[in-house]
C-alpha cells in the first residue's frame, strides 16, 4: 500500500503543471484513471509508469526505482488476510502504518487500537455495528489489531507517541478484569524505548483537539519523505497530505503533548485508574 501511495505522490509531483488530459493520453488511459492513480486509489503497470515518467522528464535511474514501485504496489499486503473485517477505507491506513517510521496519535475516548489487548479489542469490536457479527469477522478484526502491534515491538520498530485523554482510563470496556488488564498493558508498553505515552488530564482544561482523534504517519519511499494525517469518522476516513494539513495537525499534536502529563505523572494517573476499578 505504501508503494502505491509513494508512486501516486511522485507521479503527481512529477506531472507538475502539465494537464492531466495530456499525461493520460501518453499512457493511453482516461483523465479519471490518472486521477485515481494520483490519489493512490488505483495502480498502473510498470510500463505505464515508465511512459509517464519519461514524458515528465524524470531521470532514467529514478524512473527505474519508481517503476519497481508500480510492481510492488500490485502485491497484496499482509493485512489482506484479514479482509473480512477490513473496510476499503481503512486498508490504506494499515498499509501506511506498517511502513511508517514515526507514528503520532491522539485518542480522546479509548485506548488506541495499536495498543489494545485482545479482550479489550474484542469488547469494542462486538459493539461496532460496522463489523459483521459472525465470529470469523470479529476474530479477524481483533487479530488485525494485534498484528499491527508488531510495528511497535518487532525489528526496526517505529517511533511512537500517543496522547490519550484521561477519560479513556475510566471508560470500562469489557468489564473490570478486561479494563484492568488493558491499563496494566498500557503501563508495560510505555516502558519500551521507542514508545512515549502521555495522559491528557482533566485538569488541563481546554485543548487544541476538541474535534476528536487523529493519527500522523511519517514514512519514506525511495529516499523521499512523506507524511499523512488520518482522521476517522463513522463509515470512513479522511486522508490529509498537503503541507498545510500536515503542519496544522503537527502543531495540534505538539500542543497536546505540551499540555499532557509528564511520564511520571502519566504513570501515576494510570495506576490511580487501576486502583479505582471495582
Description of each model-found segment:
Residues 2-13, 20-25, 39, 43-170, ...:
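Interdomain hinge/linker segments and adjacent boundary elements that couple functional modules
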Residues 16, 154, 188-191:
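Secondary-structure boundary motif
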Residues 163, 175-278:
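C-terminal regulatory/effector modules of DNA-binding transcriptional regulators
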Residues 31, 167-170, 236:
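A short, flexible beta-alpha/helix-coil linker loop
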Amino acid at each position: 500500500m505504501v508503494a502505491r501511495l509513494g508512486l501516486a505522490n511522485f507521479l503527481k509531483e512529477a506531472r507538475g503543471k502539465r494537464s492531466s488530459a495530456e499525461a493520460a493520453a501518453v499512457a493511453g488511459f482516461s483523465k479519471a484513471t490518472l486521477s485515481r492513480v494520483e490519489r493512490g486509489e488505483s495502480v498502473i503497470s510498470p510500463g505505464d509508469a515508465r511512459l509517464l515518467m519519461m514524458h515528465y522528464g524524470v531521470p532514467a535511474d529514478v524512473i527505474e526505482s519508481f517503476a519497481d514501485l508500480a510492481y510492488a504496489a500490485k502485491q497484496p499486503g499482509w493485512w489482506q488476510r484479514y479482509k473480512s473485517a477490513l473496510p476499503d477505507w481503512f486498508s490504506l491506513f494499515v498499509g501506511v502504518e506498517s511502513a511508517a517510521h514515526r507514528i503520532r496519535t491522539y485518542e480522546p475516548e479509548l485506548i488506541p487500537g495499536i495498543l489494545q489487548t485482545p479482550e479489550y479489542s474484542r469488547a469494542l469490536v462486538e459493539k461496532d455495528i460496522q463489523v459483521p457479527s459472525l465470529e470469523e469477522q470479529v476474530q479477524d478484526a481483533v487479530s488485525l489489531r494485534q498484528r499491527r502491534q508488531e510495528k511497535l515491538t518487532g525489528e526496526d520498530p517505529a517511533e511512537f507517541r500517543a496522547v490519550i485523554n484521561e477519560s479513556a482510563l475510566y471508560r470500562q470496556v469489557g468489564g473490570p478484569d478486561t479494563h484492568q488488564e488493558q491499563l496494566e498493558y498500557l503501563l508495560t508498553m510505555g516502558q519500551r524505548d521507542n514508545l512515549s505515552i502521555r495522559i491528557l488530564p482533566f485538569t488541563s482544561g481546554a485543548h487544541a483537539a476538541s474535534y476528536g482523534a487523529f493519527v500522523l504517519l511519517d514514512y519514506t519511499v525511495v529516499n523521499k519523505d512523506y507524511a499523512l494525517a488520518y482522521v476517522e469518522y463513522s463509515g470512513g476516513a479522511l486522508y490529509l497530505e498537503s503541507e498545510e494539513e500536515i503542519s496544522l495537525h503537527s502543531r495540534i499534536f505538539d500542543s497536546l503533548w505540551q499540555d499532557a502529563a509528564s511520564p511520571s505523572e502519566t504513570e501515576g494517573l494510570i495506576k490511580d485508574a487501576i486502583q479505582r476499578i471495582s
